[in-house]
């Protein structure tokens, strides 16, 4: 590679795709050299001079490293939209998060953020329901939603699974979902589970007067089977489908979104496996990028972390993810490696806080996230001393206390389910 793509005087065009990277050059490699190689490898260049790359082509398509901060190990690169297949997340990632992550010239390289131009945003559907659509679907306009995951993760029969879901709904949950590793195992077949659970969700609706949503996991070995499962849910009268976004893959997600409008289903995104490339702060891809791609493709709600639960994620990171889900215009934040993003009218996603939560954490969750969040509890409901139904009731009671500005201890004086939760989970 002979070209120099450092261009400090370049002002990105409205049609450029902008990426921010964290770069740590290998021993003996200077920062500018590493940035140049990274920019070239992610676009038009190779490891050596290539005769087939004409000066005219290079001038038109070359990347521009327009910002470098060696002390912060940060660079920003502007790429012409001509380099990308419009409407294709896999192709974008093959460029800006592909071979470059394996280059010897860097010890570590991380894609921190991508800012998409409006010309590229227009090629994507975005969420079909989005935050406001989910509120309309559930009939809940003025509070966080309460959800649960059927526990144990796997092992229950379809009948027992549906029973656990029913008790969760009856106790006050708005949403009940499968866990990420429950799909179509012998002990709990997809179609039977979906049919039984949706019937009991309907029963709970008639008993409580509230809408009850079952989020059945349609993750499958093939896109064809995934779509078949989605259509089964449609025929059964479901309102939702759930997908494991990273194991399923970006092509599967785009395929699912293309078919979701006809099915009329909201799409719940479980982010399991994301840490394989997001957790290392020096290498891979940030969770911020994953969240943006989910909104771009058109998932309706996404797990983003909790701050207070069992999953990794600092408060500033989780709040950056929240903002990327819900804001129409995301401001730049250099301290958090967030690029400005105008979402061009694509609907917001509903953020989901899930992982190691108990009812006693609801006041903190409400303080952190406000009203626009789905609070999702697993063991925090099913490990309640009085059972699943009481665990769900305790969550609703804790939420009611938070909405009214009353302490949990005060509210628990007249709510025995919450009192039992406090006795079990609240640290003395």
UniProtKB/Swiss-Prot annotation:
GO terms for biological process: AMP catabolic process; carbon fixation. It catalyses: 2 (2R)-3-phosphoglycerate + 2 H(+) = D-ribulose 1,5-bisphosphate + CO2 + H2O; D-ribulose 1,5-bisphosphate + O2 = 2-phosphoglycolate + (2R)-3-phosphoglycerate + 2 H(+). The record marks 310 as: Transition state stabilizer. Keywords: Carbon dioxide fixation, Lyase, Magnesium, Metal-binding, Oxidoreductase. Its EC number is 4.1.1.39. Binds 1 Mg(2+) ion per subunit. The modification N6-carboxylysine is found at residue 177. It comes from the Archaea. Substrate binds at residues 153, 271, 303, 354-356, 376-379. Catalyzes the addition of molecular CO(2) and H(2)O to ribulose 1,5-bisphosphate (RuBP), generating two molecules of 3-phosphoglycerate (3-PGA). Functions in an archaeal AMP degradation pathway, together with AMP phosphorylase and R15P isomerase. This is Ribulose bisphosphate carboxylase. The lineage of its organism: Archaea, Methanobacteriati, Methanobacteriota, Stenosarchaea group, Methanomicrobia. The gene is rbcL.
